[in-house]
Amino acid sequence: MLRIFCFVISWCLIAFAQPDLSGFVSILGAACGYGFFWYSLEPLKKPSLPLRTLFVSCFFWIFTIEGIHFSWMLSDQYIGKLIYLVWLTLITILSVLFSGFSCLLVAIVRQKRTAFLWSLPGVWVAIEMLRFYGIFSGMSFDYLGWPMTASAYGRQFGGFLGWAGQSFAVIAVNMSFYCLLLKKPHAKMLWVLTLLLPYTFGAIHYEYLKHAFQQDKRALRVAVVQPAHPPIRPKLKSPIVVWEQLLQLVSPIQQPIDLLIFPEVVVPFGKHRQVYPYESCAHLLSSFAPLPEGKAFLSNSDCATALSQHFQCPVIIGLERWVKKENVLYWYNSAEVISHKGISVGYDKRILVPGGEYIPGGKFGSLICRQLFPKYALGCKRLPGRRSGVVQVRGLPRIGITICYEETFGYRLQSYKRQGAELLVNLTNDGWYPESRLPKVHFLHGMLRNQEFGMPCVRACQTGVTAAVDSLGRILKILPYDTRETKAPSGVLETSLPLFNYKTLYGYCGDYPMILIAFCAVSYLGGGFLGYRLLAKKEIR
């Protein structure tokens, strides 16, 4: 009966240990949820389950939980029914990894190899790195330590060891709690210590920084546009209609501002393609700035330059970029920083979305897609960018730009800190998964970079979370976003963003300390098991 209770209570705790669902359940689940589950697999009193039954039970438990955690993927209005197969594949892979780890833990407990037990947090980090670095472009959502970030102190701990340190801590805490349930000596003290230590480090650092924050008076006045356009729009009567809607949004902006930001691919036709009739643009932009003479048609660059001249500040805008090489047309998802003189500095997205921006498996994957799923085959070759994401604009701090879910990969953004970035700007569009949890899930994963690197961030989104967040992870201003109950309205976020920056261990070292810990843990466990087997063979002889 106790095993069933632990199984059920652990499922409830971990299934809803999501910061977007419940902060309290997230913290509680991170403290004891997995410990209850492992106790249900291997309790103090026997009988023990056969290994196969153990794996199946574990797989069922985590498979149903991962299904809830990634339920936002099942919004198929724009993505299509193939997303169900992608969802099933993803949660199956994640479930197999966790089930294998749990069976390893139980096997060590059964053999009473306590010395090996404490290598397991590092082993889990090594396993989780497979998903961060190895599953397609990397799966950064819903890592095991994410529930810790429901607390400001838990998020601040990420400034020391990043996402991997948070996952390490959650595994260590729950193993200690499991040992407490097994009535192991010193387990209670160990559980309290592993539970409080990460939050204590985070709390001390956070409270110290709050005091230092007050001494820095620098701020940036930003205006962030949320057009709230759906991903697939009805056929336009005229190309200029998109700019007409955007200009209606920006015209009430209170001046002066230092930076005007638009979301990912906010207008079609790329940067330089001249598709907008001059007369139509002159009618719309006459109250903003003079337009270049001698052109029959204007481009997105011309329109953005006019806005930059009007507001006397740079404009960051998400655009497509097309490049023809050897008779092959390549597509880049880009961000352009355009000054009032028309000078542009660009960045191309580096981490592409599997399926949406590239087909995994190279030529073989593309062939299979064309044969079995022709509807989802991509019309042109899409490439990851190589241009630096850190841009320097006169009169502004260095800006680190990310597009879409790039902001959720801490190790990718470490180079931004080294290059002197003081502000993160993310351009995104979560509208591909309407009426789902994705906007908030994406936002909460992205804002972790603030405290990992000690930088504020601004997010510009079509229908997701458009927000300004300071370097301590405090939300300064946020626009309404798309949920199951409400549609995101169009609007402009205007705020003064404090530029307080600080150095962090994670910003300096990145994932390398945890990679070293993971390597040592795997080596110790592997070497220990090998030595144990060799010793057993000698005894048999």
From Swiss-Prot:
Presence of the UniProt keyword Signal in the record: no
GO CC terms in record: plasma membrane
Pathway membership: Protein modification; lipoprotein biosynthesis (N-acyl transfer)
Record EC number: 2.3.1.269
Keywords, comma-separated and alphabetical: Acyltransferase, Cell inner membrane, Cell membrane, Membrane, Transferase, Transmembrane, Transmembrane helix
Domain CN hydrolase, chain residue ranges per copy: 220-499
Assigned protein family: Belongs to the CN hydrolase family. Apolipoprotein N-acyltransferase subfamily.
Protein name: Apolipoprotein N-acyltransferase
Described function: Catalyzes the phospholipid dependent N-acylation of the N-terminal cysteine of apolipoprotein, the last step in lipoprotein maturation.
Any one biological process term the GO annotation gives: lipoprotein biosynthetic process
